[in-house]
C-alpha cells in the first residue's frame, strides 16, 4: 500500500470512527424542538378556505402581484 493510501485510510476511515459522537443536547437540535408544536398543529378544511380567502383578498389589493388563472 502506498503512503498516500495509508494516509487516506487513516484520515477517511479510522479518524471518523475514533471521533467522539455528538451528545443529544446540541444547539443544532434546539430549533427542531421549538418547531415541534408548530408541526403538531392541524389545519382543518375550513382553515384552508380562510387562508385562501385572505390570500385572494391580498392579491386583489396588490394588483401588481395579481396573476389571473
Curated annotation (Swiss-Prot):
Gene Ontology molecular functions: ion channel inhibitor activity; potassium channel regulator activity; toxin activity
InterPro entries: Conotoxin (IPR004214)
Endpoints of the signal sequence: 1-20
Tissue/organ expression: Expressed by the venom duct.
Superkingdom assignment: Eukaryota
The UniProt record lists the keyword DNA-binding: no
Keywords: Ion channel impairing toxin, Neurotoxin, Potassium channel impairing toxin, Secreted, Signal, Toxin, Voltage-gated potassium channel impairing toxin
A GO-annotated cellular component: extracellular region
Location(s) in or outside the cell: Secreted
Pfam families with a match to the protein in the record: Conotoxin
Entry keyword Zinc: no
Propeptide residues per the UniProt entry: 21-69
Function: Tyrosine-rich conopeptide that specifically targets voltage-gated potassium channel Kv1.6/KCNA6 (IC(50) is 8.8 uM) that is expressed in Xenopus oocytes. In vivo, causes seizures (at 5 nmol) and death (20 nmol) when intracranially injected into mice, and causes paralysis (at 10 pmol) to C.elegans.
Remaining remarks: The mature peptide does not contain cysteine residues.
Similarity comment: Belongs to the conotoxin M superfamily. Conopeptide Y family.
Name used for this protein in its record: Conopeptide Y-Fe1
Source organism (scientific name): Conus ferrugineus
Source species taxonomy: Eukaryota, Metazoa, Spiralia, Lophotrochozoa, Mollusca
